[in-house]
Amino acid sequence: MKILRKNHPLLKIINHSFIDLPTPSNISSWWNFGSLLGVCLMIQILTGLFLAMHYTSDTTTAFSSVAHICRDVNYGWLIRYLHANGASMFFICLFIHVGRGIYYGSYVLSETWNIGIILFLTTMATAFVGYVLPWGQMSFWGATVITNLLSAIPYIGNTLVEWIWGGFSVDKATLTRFFAFHFILPFIITAFALVHLLFLHETGSNNPSGLNSDSDKIPFHPYYTIKDLLGIFLLLLALMILALFFPDVLGDPDNFTPANPLNTPAHIKPEWYFLFAYAILRSIPNKLGGVLALILSILILAAFPLLNTSKQHGLIFRPVTQAIYWTFIANLLVLTWIGGQPVEYPFTTIGQXASITYFTIIIILMPVSNIIENNIIKL
C-alpha cells in the first residue's frame, strides 16, 4: 500500500497533498479552518444537490417548492436547514481563515492569497444568488436592490442591469438564471480551491512564529489529520445545534412571506455575512461612490502584500500592529451591526465613521505601524 500511494499517478498527488506533506510542527488550531472550509463546501454541494431535485426555479412555484421540501420530502426540512445554516458556518470559517491570514502574515504567499480573494468573491456571489432562490420578500427585494447597483456604472449601467434581469424587472428570467449560477458556481469554487491548495503546497504553510520552519517539519498524516478531524467534529456539532435547535435565527422573518413586487419591506438587508459590506455601501450618499466602496471593501485585501513593509513575519511579536488589528476586528463587528440597522440617525453617522476607520486602518495605520516597529528593532 505504501509503495502504491507513492508511485500510483493519482494516489501520488493525494499522498503529496494530505499524507506525506511536510508541515510545520507548530501550526495551531487557527490553521484548521482551511480543511473546515473544504468540509463546508462538500456539505453545501451535497445538500444543495438534494434540494435541487425538488426545487422549481419558477416565480409562481419557487416559494411553494421550498415549503414542499420542508413539509413533504423525507428529511427535507433537515436538508434545507443544513444548507441554509451551512452557508453561515461557511462564512464564519471563511472570515476566521482570512483573519488568520492577516494576523500571521500569510498574504506574503501572494499567489495563494490572490486566489483566496477570488474564492472569497466567488463564494459571496454564490451566497447572494442562492439567497434569491426561496423567492420570499427579502429574496426578491434583496435581488432588486443589489443588482440595481450596477446601474451606477456610467454609460452601460442600465443596459447591464436589464441584461442581468433578463427583462425590465426581477422576474422569472432572473430566478432561472440565478438558479443556474447557484448550481454551477460551487464547482468553480472547488476548482479554485484545488488551485489555492496547489500554490500553497508550492511554498509550504506559514506558521505562528513567522520563522522559517524548513528544519522542523513533520508529515501531515497522522498528526494534522487527527487535529483536522477534531475540528470537523466540532464544526458538525455547531452546525447540527444551529440547524436543529435554532434553524431560523440567522434568517429574515420577511422571507416567510412570498415575494410581492407591490409591497416593499420596511428594512431591506442581505444575510448577516454581507452586512459589513452593505454598511460601507450605505454610508456613502453617492450611488457610484457606494458601489466602488463596496467592491474595494473586499478587493483591498489584495493590497496587504503591497502595503507590507515589516521586517517581521506576522503579528506575533508586534504589539503595536496587534492593537491595530484587534481594533480592525472590532470595527468589522460594528459595521456588521450597523448594516442590520435602519437608515437613520445615529446609525448612519456610526456607519460612516466605521467605514472611514475600515479603510484608514488598512491603508494608513498598518503600514505606519510597520515602519514604527522596524525602527524599534534597530534601537
Curated annotation (Swiss-Prot):
Q: Where are the transmembrane segments?
A: 33-53, 77-98, 113-133, 178-198, 226-246, 288-308, 320-340, 347-367
Q: Cofactor(s) for this protein? A: heme b
Q: Which PROSITE patterns match?
A: CYTB_CTER (PS51003), CYTB_NTER (PS51002)
Where does this protein hold heme b b566?
97, 196
What are the entry keywords? Electron transport, Heme, Iron, Membrane, Metal-binding, Mitochondrion, Mitochondrion inner membrane, Respiratory chain, Transmembrane, Transmembrane helix, Transport, Ubiquinone
**Which GO MF term does the entry hold, naming one?**
ubiquinol-cytochrome-c reductase activity
What membrane topology does the annotation report for this chain? Answer: Multi-pass membrane protein
Which GO CC terms are listed, alphabetically?
mitochondrial inner membrane; respiratory chain complex III
Task: Report the superkingdom from the record.
Answer: Eukaryota
Q: Which InterPro entries match?
A: Cyt_b/b6_C, Cyt_b/b6_C_sf, Cyt_b/b6_N, Cytb/b6-like_sf, Cytochrome_b, Cytochrome_b_C_euk/bac, Cytochrome_b_N_euk/bac, Di-haem_cyt_TM
One GO biological-process annotation of the entry reads: mitochondrial electron transport, ubiquinol to cytochrome c
Question: How and how many cofactors are bound, per the record note?
Answer: Binds 2 heme b groups non-covalently.
Q: Which residues bind heme b b562?
A: 83, 182
Q: Which residues bind a ubiquinone?
A: 201
Subcellular location, principal: mitochondrion
Task: Enumerate the subcellular locations listed in this protein's record, separating them with semicolons.
Answer: Mitochondrion inner membrane
What's the stated role of this polypeptide?
Answer: Component of the ubiquinol-cytochrome c reductase complex (complex III or cytochrome b-c1 complex) that is part of the mitochondrial respiratory chain. The b-c1 complex mediates electron transfer from ubiquinol to cytochrome c. Contributes to the generation of a proton gradient across the mitochondrial membrane that is then used for ATP synthesis.
Q: What else is known?
A: Heme 1 (or BL or b562) is low-potential and absorbs at about 562 nm, and heme 2 (or BH or b566) is high-potential and absorbs at about 566 nm.
Q: What family does the Swiss-Prot or TrEMBL record give for this protein?
A: Belongs to the cytochrome b family.
Tell me how this protein assembles. Answer: The cytochrome bc1 complex contains 11 subunits: 3 respiratory subunits (MT-CYB, CYC1 and UQCRFS1), 2 core proteins (UQCRC1 and UQCRC2) and 6 low-molecular weight proteins (UQCRH/QCR6, UQCRB/QCR7, UQCRQ/QCR8, UQCR10/QCR9, UQCR11/QCR10 and a cleavage product of UQCRFS1). This cytochrome bc1 complex then forms a dimer.
**PANTHER family, sorted:** CYTOCHROME B
What is the protein name given in its UniProt record? Cytochrome b
Source species, please? Akodon orophilus
Gene field = MT-CYB
